[in-house]
Amino acid sequence: GLQIVESVGADIRFLVFNPKDPAAGKLAVRQAVAQLVNRDALVAKVYRGTAEPLYSMVPKGIAGHATSFFDTYGDPDVAKARELLSEAGITAPVKMTFWYTTDRYGSSTATEFAELKRQLEASGLFRITLRSAPWKSFQEGFNKGAYPVFGRGWFPDFPDPDNFVAPFVGPDSVTGTPYLSNEITRELLPSSRKESDRGAVSDQFKRAQDILVKDVRLLPLWQGKLYVAAGEDIGGGERALDPQTVMQMWELYRKTSW
């Protein structure tokens, strides 16, 4: 027989909000989107359980992972989202355009954004227009700041929380939309880089994630999963994969019976 061993991966997907956009630039609008997105439904309908809801930019399996967005927003709640907009004097429905790339992250991306549109519009608080482009022109567009809201994916160069925060914060953010946070770039990141024991930097990165939640410039959606298929006589599959997707073959062994 065959056994399937499942593990969390380090690839993530998230939304980026352009602060220069008339709608996406408003904190209450971003907070309302964060209050409405149903990650469980998203991964169930679109990815059939092969992805996992993500509530921070640092994914599960990486030191410093937290559930900051869930801790702040909890389950999707239309009433709370409506209140956020109302208190900010914003009239619903809010019109926004969401962009995604057609050829970078797989064919399910279009279905994913259709589901995001459905969720937001079902609240009655948003009217979402979807636009897409091939990766080359998509990349040119977000680097010019042309997109109000757009989807990005990320796979780290190395499995460290720094690689899930530093690239997105600062004047040269890889998202093409500068994100200035002096506390993160001048205090938390430099402090964490002095620590060789990466398991000891959780406090700095949890604080960084609290700041990311407060600003809602980035909205994490999901992280991928990894799978190993092996015969039932093979053990160690659960240790053979790490979040960097490096196959650690030495962890595999043939079971013996006595």
Which positions does each model-derived feature cover?
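Extracytoplasmic/secreted envelope proteins and their assembly/folding machinery
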Residues: F14, R30, A34, R39-V43, ...
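Extracytoplasmic/peripheral linker and loop segments enriched in polar/acidic and small residues
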Residues: A28, V43-A44, G74, A122, ...
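Periplasmic-binding protein-like
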Residues: L2-V16, I62, G170-E187
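Ligand-binding "clamshell"
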Residues: G1-E6, A146, D160-T175, G231-G237
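A bilobed periplasmic-binding-protein/Venus flytrap-type ligand-binding module shared by bacterial periplasmic
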Residues: S7-A32, K45, L189, G224
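Long beta-strand-rich cores associated with HINT superfamily self-processing modules
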Residues: E115, V228-W258
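Structural transition elements
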Residues: A24, P53-E87, R104-T111
